Amino acid sequence: MVKSEMKLVIFSLFLLLIGVESLKNGYPVIEGGGSPDYGESAECGSEDSNSADNFCNDICTNVGGKSGDCCLGSCFCFDLPDEQKTVEVMDRTKEYCEFVE
């Protein structure tokens, strides 16, 4: 009896883990963003990197992300919800932007 109850508990925990929503990082697709390098992501980049990072942080939180920074001329967001579309980029680019956060 104890083994079957333990199996049920483990199975229940497994189902809970499957249902957990994961978050992703990337360049969010923004209608009308028009960055020449990253499709429809929000373009940033100015002489003042603090204002570019603040701009990107605002963009990213508006689309449901935790935060964002200007990376390689476009806004790169952290902890975006799964339903947010992101621009397809090489893994190396994504890893770079995650590293320099």
From Swiss-Prot:
Provide the tissue specificity.
Expressed by the venom gland.
| Intracellular or extracellular location(s) | Secreted
Keywords on this record?
Disulfide bond, Ion channel impairing toxin, Neurotoxin, Secreted, Signal, Toxin, Voltage-gated sodium channel impairing toxin
Annotated GO MF terms: sodium channel inhibitor activity; toxin activity
Q: Write down the InterPro entries for this protein, in alphabetical order.
A: LCN-type_CS_alpha_beta_dom, Scorpion_toxin-like_sf, Scorpion_toxinL/defensin
Disulphide linkage map: C44-C70, C56-C75, C60-C77, C71-C97
The record's section on PROSITE patterns has: LCN_CSAB
Q: Name one GO cellular component term.
A: extracellular region
Taxonomically, the superkingdom here is: Eukaryota
Domain LCN-type CS-alpha/beta stretches: 24-98
The primary location reported for this protein is secreted
User: What domain comment accompanies this record?
Assistant: Has the structural arrangement of an alpha-helix connected to antiparallel beta-sheets by disulfide bonds (CS-alpha/beta).
**Sequence similarity:** Belongs to the long (4 C-C) scorpion toxin superfamily. Sodium channel inhibitor family. Beta subfamily.
The entry's protein name is: Toxin Tpa8
